[in-house]
Amino acid sequence: MPEMVDSNSTPSSSTGSRTVLLLLRVLTFVFLLIALILIAIVKQTDDETGVEIKFNDIYAYRYMISTIIIGFAYNLLQMALSIFTVVSGNRVLSGDGGYLFDFFGDKIISYLLISGSAAGFGVTVELGRGVPSNSFMDKANASASLLLIAFLFTAVASTFTSFALPKKD
């Protein structure tokens, strides 16, 4: 005689993947927030001239903060949609359009995040040549590192959204 399985005892794979996706979005949100705070507070005063240098004085750091803000806004929207989906069991954006929005949105945002991280790393290396390590470079490098980690979480989330795409024959 077949065994009866209680369907309420373990979550379905769909619920499990939605929860994992929400967790990835929360982690991305946290890392983007910390990266944003770090790059926004970074400043250095030149000992010789007394000129204060901030992130907005360097184009690559401006680009980096722009990618953080865009990623932050997108991720905030996706977190809200994910929370609604996990709590209610229904998607806000139903049909193929919602899945395509998730899929392409995650792809585009992940590419933006990695390009922002690369720009931050690149300019930090260039500016740091021949200069002893300082707080400005260390904080900017830490922000680029956190942005890289946020990219990794978004890339993994992108994999989950690609699995959710409706199968077309």
Curated annotation (Swiss-Prot):
It is found in: Cell membrane. Glycans are attached at residue 141. Residues 43-66, 129-145 are extracellular. Keywords: Cell membrane, Glycoprotein, Membrane, Transmembrane, Transmembrane helix. GO terms for cellular component: plasma membrane. Residues 1-21, 88-107, 167-169 are cytoplasmic. InterPro entries: CASP/CASPL, CASP_dom. The chain crosses the membrane at residues 22-42, 67-87, 108-128, 146-166. Its main location: membrane. It is a multi-pass membrane protein. Homodimer and heterodimers. Belongs to the Casparian strip membrane proteins (CASP) family. This is CASP-like protein 4D1. It comes from Glycine max (Soybean).
